Amino acid sequence: VTMAPVVQLWRRARRTGQLPDPARLAEARQLVGIRHLTLEPRQHRRLRAGLTRPGMRIDFGGIAKGYAAQEALAQLSGLGVSRALVAIGGDISVGQPPPGESGWRVDVAPLDGAKGKPELRLSLREAAVSTSGDAMQAVVIDGIRYSHIVDPRTGVGLEGQRSVTVVASLGATADVLATTLCILGPDRGIALIDQLGKTDRRLAARYVDTDRQVVSKGWSAHLAASGRPPAAVVTP
């Protein structure tokens, strides 16, 4: 969440078609890191966040939509609405399925994000799904394709094209893990999902790029056959 100074430089790069200035990028990277973020307990189980360096900013891009969908679903449940689907961009949270259905049908868009051409279909109940990728937000500079997803280890936008879809019990979990897998890559990313899946039975993921597709152990349990139109489409 402290990546905002670096992310801002890459947003400008997508607008101008020019790579971030190396000196400014180096300065921005000095403002990144959880060590520069303080959390102070407050009343009612709340925390007060503090930024210890001038120029620091917070960016919730890797978790906000998933969390918002999760909380919206919780609010509906609190009002007695148990059968619901909340979609915010590429992040979806679902409750109990529609009457007579085993789950909510959610289509996953292909790597290039093409509309009307779903690559596969999921069936979900009381779960969340998030897709992270760069089909819609990338820039090509000097023949290299840079994603809007920035690797915090290097401060550089990910190169190439990829799409990660994660199913989890909670929207925030699905959202943050989808972004994390984009950065870690298929081997380390899917290994992480398989490990975490031991404590979240719904957790599963699919990583696809221009060369290959890798899925976690529990992925196939969420697949659905084609049939009636989907309730939503999750896009990168």
Spans of features found by a protein language model:
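Mature catalytic core of soluble alpha/beta enzymes
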Residues: 1-236
